[in-house]
Amino acid sequence: KRVAREAAVLLYTSQEKEYKQAKKQAVETLGIRVLPSNLEVAEELDKIAEEKEGFSRRELLLRMRKEALQIMEALKDFNPRLVGSVWRGTVHQNSDIDIFTFSQDPKLILDRLQKYGYKVTSSEWCSVTKKGKKDSSFHSHFILSSGDEAEVVVRDPEKLGRLERCEIY
């Protein structure tokens, strides 16, 4: 429980961006060997956000979902899917909007974002290995007029329609 809370604090304060790194740092800081599950960390993160942000979280969630809808409408030809904390309804002050899209050509998505006035701040290819299989996707980050951040991930169209398990819940 202490490790989950410490990892959640690291995520909430943006000292870490990913659950895996937050859990490793928490274990190191507390000198404990057992890693909590992502669910345990997520529950603690939700408690912290509720304690610190209260009702303003609901307003934040509504605003971010409206922004996500605008982005998704701009990218409708690329089968956008809202994922992450905005989709789950567990946003906090440092949350970003995460959207998956599907295309063979990431430039098409970058061009569409720019056409709709979104200013991309960074883009990169990312690779991960899950269950022995390497997977690559293209990630674009941008800041919205509200100050919120968004990330659009371009995935291979072959992945469209595949069911994926949430790594947190």
Give each language-model segment a name.
Residues 1-16, 20-93, 103-169:
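Catalytic core of pol beta-like nucleotidyltransferases
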